[in-house]
Structures are given as structure tokens and as C-alpha cells.
């Protein structure tokens, strides 16, 4: 369901100005969440396998099947065809690494635990060049369990106070293709030897396969040009990827670990949906772009199911007079440029909810 009138972005609140509770707060956050879960489960039960998993699996399969066309386009000297190859490879790369890894991390691609593990290793380690264990721990066990709780799931890993607003917003995203495998290798010190060796092998397989295909299929003549093309395709959507990760949580209410609200209040206050953007919805997935609130409330739902339950969730939250944060990419971009010091450099103020 498209928002008819986007809400203004929620501003951080000082602890001396506590937020007023919703009128339905006396019913308790747990009761509200159970009521919403029943409504969502009714939608899930009446949905086919195609709706629950098939649509997203088809998008990922299409991205894999489109890779040969992208590599072959790079053989052409025609600038338009070459640019098409870069675009195909870049969009497919982000579809596999962001959408695929995100769904695999949550076990939303299949109901089989064995296949969930296989897809997790493939998308996170082979495609993304990161560690499956740290992706699961950092994203699922910390960010989702403690959304916007300062020091736990507050998205602070995305803050780089040493950079000014223009360097961060425009230049820092280019570091992502290089920083991702380097961070992964650094974190291997904290895992068992067998796990570290497996991760190194899978990351190396993914990176070398990309490099080998550029040399042997795309026809690049020297290693430096192949590495440059790897960097170009892997950074194609790096800017919106970094921006989205900060737009949807930072600048919204933050909570202390000792006084965090109930789950439904935490997610409705601390999560924001962006307006639908076709390319980003395709490459990153609805659960990251336009259905992020729904995803945080029901993280095991696939992207397509998050989109399907969105009308139910948005109507329920509004009927119960709970926040349902929505904004456009451009509006958040302008807001972060204007208030970068407050959002990305200074310590976030703590929001206290009176009566919840």
C-alpha cells in the first residue's frame, strides 16, 4: 500500500522531554504485538509458496542467470554495450549480496534448515565476501533484538565521526567493496580455526571467480583493468546502500539498554520505511527499502511477504495510534546533510517513553 501522505521524519528526543504514550498503551505492548501477529499469520497462511518464497527466489535466480550476459557485454568496444555490462553486473551483484544475503541471514529463503545454511554461506561468504557467523550475530542477534538500543543495535557501526558530511555521504561509499573483505578477515580472529578456514576459502572462491571471469570471458588483457572493473561493479550501488543503512534508524528515537520499550513500540518508533524505489526495491529488497518496519516486526518473512502484509501492519499501527514512520530517500538525504553533526558525530540523545 503506497503512503498517501508521508509523515515527517521523527526527530531525536531529549530525556527531559519524554514522549507521550499511545492511547492504547494500557493494553500492553505484548498484547498489541500478539494481536498484530494473528492478523499477519492469517495473511501468511492464505499465501501460496510462490508468494512466501518463490517470487524472491525467482529474482535471485534471474540475477544469477543474467551474469553471463553482463560478462559478455564487457567484451564489446562499443561504449553503450560496455556500460550495459557494467550495469547488469552491478545490479546483479547487489541483488545477490544485499537482497540474497539479507534473506539468507534471516532464513527467509526456505523453510529447510539445511538449505538455509547452504544459502547463508553462498550469499554471505561467496557473493558478499563477509563472514556468515558475524553477519548473523551482528544483524539478527544484535540489530534486530536491540533495535536503536544505544551500544547494542543502534547502527553505530555506520558512524565515522572523523569524516565530514560530504566525504561521508559522497566518497566513503567507495570504500565498501574494499572494506568488506578486510573487515571479514579481521573478524576471523574471533572464530574457530575450521570456521575461519572455510570462510577464507569461500571468500577467496567468490573474489577469484569474479576476477577469472573478467579475464577469460570478458577478455580483459591485464590484471589491473580486471581489478578496476571488479571495483566498479561492486561499488555501483554502494552509495544508496550506505545511505539506506543510516536513513532508516539514525535520527529516530534511541533507547537505553536498561529502559528499552516493548518490542512493538521499539520497532514502530525506531524504524522507518522509505518510499518505493524500483531499482532499490529490486536490488536490496522490499524489507530493506519500503517495508523495513514490517521486516523488523516479522524478520522471517520474505521481501514479497513483507510487501503483502504492509497494508495490514500500517493500518493496525495507525488504528492503535502508534508511529508508522515513512519518508522519501531524497528527504532523508537532505535531512542528513543538514544535520550530519547531530546525527552522525554527536552521541544520540536517549528517548524515554512515559507510561510504557
From Swiss-Prot:
Q: Region Disordered: list its residue ranges.
A: 1-25
Q: What enzyme category does the UniProt record give?
A: oxidoreductase
Q: Where are the sequence repeats?
A: 1-6, 7-12, 13-18
Where is the motif Histidine box-2 annotated in this sequence?
139-143
Which parts of the sequence are annotated with region: 3 X 6 AA tandem repeat of M-E-P-T-E-P?
A: 1-18
As for subcellular location, the record says: Membrane
- The residue numbers the entry assigns to motif Histidine box-3 are 292-296
Listed A to Z, the keywords are: Fatty acid biosynthesis, Fatty acid metabolism, Lipid biosynthesis, Lipid metabolism, Membrane, Oxidoreductase, Repeat, Transmembrane, Transmembrane helix
Give residue numbers for sequence motif Histidine box-1.
Answer: 102-106
**What is this entry's stated membrane topology?**
Multi-pass membrane protein
Disulfide bond positions:
none
Membrane-spanning intervals of the chain: 54-74, 78-98, 118-138, 166-186, 200-220, 269-289
Pathway terms, separated by semicolons: Lipid metabolism; fatty acid metabolism
Query: GO biological process annotations for this chain's record?
Result: fatty acid biosynthetic process; lipid metabolic process
The record's EC number reads 1.14.19.-
Alphabetically, the GO molecular function entries are: oxidoreductase activity, acting on paired donors, with oxidation of a pair of donors resulting in the reduction of molecular oxygen to two molecules of water
Main localization is membrane
**GO CC annotation terms, alphabetical:** membrane
**Which family is annotated?**
Belongs to the fatty acid desaturase type 1 family.
Question: What is the designated name of this protein?
Answer: Fatty acid desaturase 6
Species for this entry:
Homo sapiens
Amino acid at each position: 500500500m503506497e503512503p498517501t501522505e508521508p509523515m515527517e521524519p521523527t526527530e531525536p528526543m531529549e530525556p527531559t522531554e519524554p514522549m507521550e504514550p499511545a492511547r492504547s498503551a494500557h493494553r500492553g505492548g505484548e498484547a498489541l504485538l500478539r494481536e498484530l501477529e494473528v492478523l499477519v499469520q492469517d495473511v501468511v497462511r492464505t499465501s501460496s509458496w510462490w508468494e512466501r518464497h518463490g517470487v524472491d527466489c525467482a529474482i535471485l535466480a534471474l540475477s544469477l542467470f543474467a551474469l553471463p550476459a553482463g560478462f559478455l557485454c564487457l567484451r564489446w568496444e562499443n561504449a553503450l554495450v560496455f556500460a550495459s555490462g557494467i550495469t547488469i553486473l552491478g545490479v546483479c551483484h547487489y541483488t545477490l549480496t544485499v537482497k540474497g544475503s539479507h534473506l539468507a541471514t534471516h532464513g527467509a529463503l526456505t523453510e529447510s534448515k539445511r538449505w538455509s545454511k547452504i544459502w547463508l554461506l553462498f550469499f554471505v561468504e561467496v557473493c558478499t565476501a563477509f563472514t556468515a557467523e558475524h553477519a548473523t550475530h551482528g544483524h539478527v542477534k544484535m540489530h534486530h533484538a536491540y533495535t536503536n538500543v544505544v551500544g547494542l543495535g543502534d547502527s553505530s557501526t555506520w558512524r565515522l565521526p572523523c569524516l565530514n558530511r560530504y566525504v561521508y555521504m559522497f566518497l566513503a561509499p567507495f570504500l565498501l567493496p574494499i572494506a568488506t573483505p578486510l573487515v571479514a578477515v579481521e573478524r576471523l580472529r574471533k572464530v574457530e580455526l575450521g570456521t575461519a578456514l572455510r570462510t577464507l576459502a569461500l571468500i577467496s572462491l567468490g573474489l577469484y571467480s569474479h576476477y577469472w571471469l573478467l579475464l577469460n570471458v570478458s577478455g580483459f588483457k591485464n590484471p589491473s583493468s580486471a581489478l578496476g572493473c571488479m571495483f566498479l561493479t561492486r561499488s555501483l550501488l554502494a552509495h544508496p546502500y550506505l545511505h539506506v543503512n543510516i536513513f532508516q534508524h539514525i535520527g529516530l528515537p534511541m533507547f537505553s539498554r536498561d529502559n528499552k520499550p516493548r518490542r512493538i513500540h521499539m520497532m514502530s518508533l525506531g524504524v522507518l520505511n522509505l518510499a518505493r524505489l524500483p531499482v532499490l526495491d529490486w536490488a536490496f529488497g522490499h524489507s530493506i527499502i519500503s517495508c523495513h518496519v514490517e521486516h523488523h516486526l516479522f524478520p522471517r518473512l520474505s521481501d514479497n511477504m513483507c510487501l503483502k502484509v504492509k497494508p495490514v501492519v500500517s493500518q493496525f499501527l495507525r488504528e492503535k495510534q502508534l508511529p508508522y514512520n515513512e519518508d522519501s530517500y531524497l528527504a532523508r538525504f537532505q535531512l542528513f546533510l543538514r544535520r550530519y553533526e547531530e546525527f552522525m558525530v554527536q552521541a544520540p540523545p536517549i528517548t524515554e517513553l512515559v507510561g510504557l
